[in-house]
Amino acid sequence: MPRKGNIAKRDVLADPVYNSKLVTKLINHLMIDGKKAKASSILYDAFGIIQDKTGKEPVEVFEEAMNNVMPVLEVKARRIGGSNYQIPVEVRPERRTTLGLRWLVSYARLRNEHTMDERLANEIMDAANNTGSAVKKREDVHRMAEANRAFAHYRF
């Protein structure tokens, strides 16, 4: 934590092709070793696959997938009286999008399709249909929060 007050958040620029800040954030999460051009070409190829398979606008499918992946609740560990409790807390909006993007990309990387653009496209389409590993992760996080609802009065 900084000693000299809060640091101002840097705002990402909207994507030049789809004019969406969420798409830019997804490109930044896809990027490895600063290779942004490679990450954006992977994403645009994935969006092309989504367009071909669904016939819908790929950004709309992606936003629907993000709504199905972003968590509302999560648990945080807190030590009280010598034992650790998992306390359910609401997720801030910025953290919701970050977690959703992180889960989408990480579970897309674990898939078995041949190229990364196929993996990403299929993971986004699965998430839009409320299936897939990223949605399962969200359900697991919500299940943990629900199971520990008894400790909700230990606020952070």
From Swiss-Prot:
One Pfam entry name: Ribosomal_S7
Family statement: Belongs to the universal ribosomal protein uS7 family.
Protein name from the UniProt record: Small ribosomal subunit protein uS7
Gene: rpsG
PROSITE patterns attached to this UniProt entry: RIBOSOMAL_S7
Role according to the record: One of the primary rRNA binding proteins, it binds directly to 16S rRNA where it nucleates assembly of the head domain of the 30S subunit. Is located at the subunit interface close to the decoding center, probably blocks exit of the E-site tRNA.
A molecular function GO annotation: tRNA binding
Lineage: Bacteria, Bacillati, Bacillota, Bacilli, Lactobacillales
GO cellular component, one term: small ribosomal subunit
Gene3D superfamilies cross-referenced by the UniProt entry: Ribosomal protein S7 domain
Keyword field contains rRNA-binding: yes
GO biological process: translation
This protein's UniProt keywords: Ribonucleoprotein, Ribosomal protein, RNA-binding, rRNA-binding, tRNA-binding
Subunit structure: Part of the 30S ribosomal subunit. Contacts proteins S9 and S11.
